[in-house]
């Protein structure tokens, strides 16, 4: 009886790990308050990178270009110039407060 010492190799190359399968976490950018919506002072209006929307009346701009309301009021998104947009917050009128 003959005893053979065999080592068997794979006849196809093994599959390595994929180079895909990763993604960065979303930053949740965009408008957080709609046009005509009532907001409180300090509420975030828009989260953005760069000044896609510029701050208007009663709106501040954070260090990461986030727009926020400086007063309680109604949000208005307006155009100025040919291509630019701005967000403003206007205080409620006395008649509007009584009607509600």
Curated annotation (Swiss-Prot):
Residues 1-9 form a propeptide. One of its GO terms (biological process) is translation. GO terms for cellular component: cytosolic large ribosomal subunit. The N-terminus is cleaved by ribosomal processing cysteine protease Prp. It holds the Pfam family Ribosomal_L27. Residues 13-32 are annotated as: Disordered. InterPro entries: Ribosomal_bL27, Ribosomal_bL27_CS. Coiled coil: none annotated. It comes from the Bacteria. Keywords: Ribonucleoprotein, Ribosomal protein. One of its GO terms (molecular function) is structural constituent of ribosome. Belongs to the bacterial ribosomal protein bL27 family. This is Large ribosomal subunit protein bL27. It comes from Clostridium kluyveri (strain ATCC 8527 / DSM 555 / NBRC 12016 / NCIMB 10680 / K1).
